[in-house]
A protein has these predicted regions:
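Polytopic transmembrane helical bundles with strong interfacial aromatic enrichment
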Residues: 1-173
């Protein structure tokens, strides 16, 4: 029965990811004037967040039952994901409690920074979700963790380029 529940929980997680990522990415692009911001997306993003947490806990519970706590909890990929989710949760709360109020006052930089960290978490989290070959010690924790700053650096470079192109389009209408 658990072998059937595991892919169903994974499907639930993928659907929540897809719905959330679509609107998170659109909101991110709106910071650069690439698309129009739509406040209605916030509700969908929060709903997706909730379902990512619930489905993630379900996946962990099923993994613990199938593999046993000793094996499942010794997986460096699991702890990389836990670390990444912690960073994502902090960035989400930073967006809601700090960056969004600043954005409403016309200060975009806090939202750009927090949004870039959040988007990097979404992208690297998706990679870890499908990188089954790296599980159970096939890649050490340090190597798995090293991928996140690389993704964050890439997105930061992209953000700088988008910000520069926005400045050019404002200066040269």
């Amino acid at each position: 029965m658990l072998e059937v529940l595991k892919p169903l929980a994974s499907l639930w997680h993928i659907i929540a990811f897809a719905c959330g990522f679509l609107f998170v990415f659109q909101s991110y692009l709106a910071l650069f004037g690439q698309v129009r911001y739509d406040r209605r997306h916030n509700r969908i993003i929060r709903y997706a967040d909730r379902h990512l947490w619930l489905s993630g806990f379900a996946i962990i519970a099923i993994g613990l039952l199938i593999n046993g706590p000793e094996t499942y909890l010794s997986n460096p990929k699991l702890w990389t994901k836990v670390t990444l989710i912690t960073i994502w949760a902090i960035s989400t709360e930073t967006i809601r409690g700090y960056a969004l109020p600043r954005l409403r006052l016309g200060q975009r930089l806090p939202m750009l920074v927090a949004g870039t960290v959040s988007l990097a978490c979404w992208i690297y989290g998706a990679f870890l979700g499908v990188a089954h070959g790296l599980a159970y010690g096939k890649a050490p924790l340090w190597a798995l963790m090293a991928g996140f700053p690389i993704v964050l650096l890439g997105l930061s470079i992209l953000a700088l380029k988008l910000k520069a192109s926005l400045a050019l389009s404002v200066d040269n209408p």
